C-alpha cells in the first residue's frame, strides 16, 4: 500500500504540473491577442482619433475573443479608446511597474471587477489592453481534482474566485510554472503525500488486483505444501490443529474376554 501511495503521489504531481502548463499556455494565448491588438493601436496613435479610428479600435477589441477594451494614452491622458466617447472602464489609470503586465483590483474599475492589464509603451504613448477576470479565471479552470491554480503577476495574485490580492510573506502554494513569453507565473498547491481519497479513487482497482494475486498465491502455496507432505505428516498436522479427534480402541485379551 505504501508503494502504491508513493506511485499515485508522483502521478498526481505530474498531473498537477501538466495542468499548470496548460493554464500558462491559455494565458499566453490571451496575451498574444493583446499584443496583436496593440499593433493596431500603434498605427492609430500616429493618426487622429476620430470615429473611424475608434471604430477600428472597437472592431479589434471585438474580434479578439478575450479582450475588453483598448486604450491609447498620450502624456498620461486618455487620447482614444475602443469605447464610444473615449470612455474607459477604469476608475483610475494605474501605474505600471517594470513589467508590461498588471493585475488591477476591483476598486480600480468602474464595474468593480478585477482585470488584467497589458501595456505597450513607446515615446510618450502608452497602449493599454484590458482583459476581464472571467477570461483569466476560465484560463485557470483546469478540470483536475484537488488542485487550485492561481495567476501571479509581480506580487499580486488572482485565483478562480475573489479579488486581486497582494502576497505578504508565506503563501501555501509552493509549486510554480513560469511563462517563457510573458512576465507571469502560475502557482498551485502540491498534492498531499498521503491521501486516502486518492488511494481509493485512483488505486482501488490496483488494490483489488493485489488482493486477488495474494489470495491466489496463498492458495497455490497451501496446495503445494500439502501435496508434498506425506500422509502421516498430514494426519499429524490435522490432529495437532484439532481437525481430527483420534479414537483409541482398547486392546482386549481374547482369552480373558
Task: State where each predicted segment sits.
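Juxtamembrane extracytoplasmic/periplasmic/luminal helical "stalk" adjacent to the first N-terminal
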Residues: 1-49
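Extracytoplasmic/periplasmic ligand-binding sensor regions of membrane-associated signaling proteins
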Residues: 61-64, 75-126
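Short, hydrophobic beta-strand elements of compact beta-sandwich sensory domains
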Residues: 124-134, 175-202
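Extracytoplasmic/periplasmic sensory segments of membrane signal-transduction proteins
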Residues: 33-87
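Cytoplasm-proximal transmembrane signaling helix
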Residues: 197-233
Amino acid at each position: 500500500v505504501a508503494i502504491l501511495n508513493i506511485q499515485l503521489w508522483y502521478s498526481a504531481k505530474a498531473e498537477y504540473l501538466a495542468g499548470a502548463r496548460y493554464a500558462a499556455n491559455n494565458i499566453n494565448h490571451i496575451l498574444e491577442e493583446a499584443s496583436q491588438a496593440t499593433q493596431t493601436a500603434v498605427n492609430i496613435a500616429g493618426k487622429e482619433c476620430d470615429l473611424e479610428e475608434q471604430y477600428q479600435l472597437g472592431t479589434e477589441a471585438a474580434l479578439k475573443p478575450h479582450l475588453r477594451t483598448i486604450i491609447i494614452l498620450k502624456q498620461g491622458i486618455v487620447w482614444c479608446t475602443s469605447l464610444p466617447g473615449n470612455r474607459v472602464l477604469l476608475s483610475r489609470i494605474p501605474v505600471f511597474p517594470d513589467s508590461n503586465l498588471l493585475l488591477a483590483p476591483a476598486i480600480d474599475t468602474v464595474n468593480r471587477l478585477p482585470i488584467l492589464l497589458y501595456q505597450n509603451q513607446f515615446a510618450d504613448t502608452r497602449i493599454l489592453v484590458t482583459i476581464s477576470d472571467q477570461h483569466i479565471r476560465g484560463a485557470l479552470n483546469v478540470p483536475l481534482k484537488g488542485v487550485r491554480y492561481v495567476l501571479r503577476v509581480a506580487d499580486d495574485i488572482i485565483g478562480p474566485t475573489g479579488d486581486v490580492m497582494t502576497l505578504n510573506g508565506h503563501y501555501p502554494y509552493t509549486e510554480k510554472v513560469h511563462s517563457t513569453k510573458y512576465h507571469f507565473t502560475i502557482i498551485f498547491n502540491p498534492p498531499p503525500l498521503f491521501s486516502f481519497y486518492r488511494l481509493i479513487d485512483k488505486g482501488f482497482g490496483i488494490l483489488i488486483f493485489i488482493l486477488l494475486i495474494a489470495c491466489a498465491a496463498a492458495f497455490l502455496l497451501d496446495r503445494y505444501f500439502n501435496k508434498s507432505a506425506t500422509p502421516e505428516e498430514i494426519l499429524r498436522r490435522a490432529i495437532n490443529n484439532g481437525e481430527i479427534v483420534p479414537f483409541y480402541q482398547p486392546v482386549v485379551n481374547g482369552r480373558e474376554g
